[in-house]
Amino acid sequence: MQLEYLNLISQAKVIAEKQFKANPFSFETIWKEVVKHFKISKQDEPSLIGRFYQDFLEDPNFVYLGDRKWKLRDFMKFDEWNKISQSMFVTKEIFEEGYEDLSNKKVEPEEGVGDFIMGNDGDDNETGSEIVQGLINDSFSEENQ
């Protein structure tokens, strides 16, 4: 069955306008109505539903409310739609919070990992290899006793 996906989406909008008006509806409900309207067979449903769902998600006429409910944007007040869109795309709060500007700060060099592992904190004159050699000598002297 060769149905144009645009026809499916545009018909879904017409169905939603007539049946649901300002009431929320589920995707399953609108899909069943589209199937009924176009007399889509059970065999053809699996090949059509995926693309229809993708187009449904991308269509700005359908607004997701959460809890698997949708609503037509035409029946929403601007404040209601704006609140939903702001909650989905929280850009204002993230970028306006006071973050410290680190771009011009001079970063102090940290103690090297090797120095930390070897126990060299810079206070003595022993190198890491001298410390290791001392540990090896201590372990051999303990074994020989």
From Swiss-Prot:
Its biological purpose is as follows: Participates in both the initiation and recycling phases of transcription. In the presence of the delta subunit, RNAP displays an increased specificity of transcription, a decreased affinity for nucleic acids, and an increased efficiency of RNA synthesis because of enhanced recycling.
Which residues belong to the signal peptide in this entry?
A: none
Q: Does the keyword Nucleotidyltransferase apply?
A: yes
Task: Specify the species.
Answer: Mycoplasma genitalium (strain ATCC 33530 / DSM 19775 / NCTC 10195 / G37)
Q: Where is the HTH HARE-type domain?
A: 6-75
Which named protein is this?
A: Probable DNA-directed RNA polymerase subunit delta
Pfam families in the cross-refs: HARE-HTH (PF05066)
- Spell out the family assignment given in the record's similarity comment: Belongs to the RpoE family.
InterPro entries, A to Z? Asxl_HARE-HTH (IPR007759), RNAP_delta_N_dom_sf (IPR038087), RpoE (IPR029757)
Q: What GO biological process terms does the UniProt entry carry, in alphabetical order?
A: DNA-templated transcription; regulation of DNA-templated transcription
Single GO cellular component term: DNA-directed RNA polymerase complex
| Quaternary data | RNAP is composed of a core of 2 alpha, a beta and a beta' subunits. The core is associated with a delta subunit and one of several sigma factors.
Check the record and name the NCBIfam families matching this protein.
RNAP_delt_lowGC
Write out the GO MF terms: DNA-directed RNA polymerase activity
Q: Which UniProt keywords apply?
A: DNA-directed RNA polymerase, Nucleotidyltransferase, Transcription, Transferase
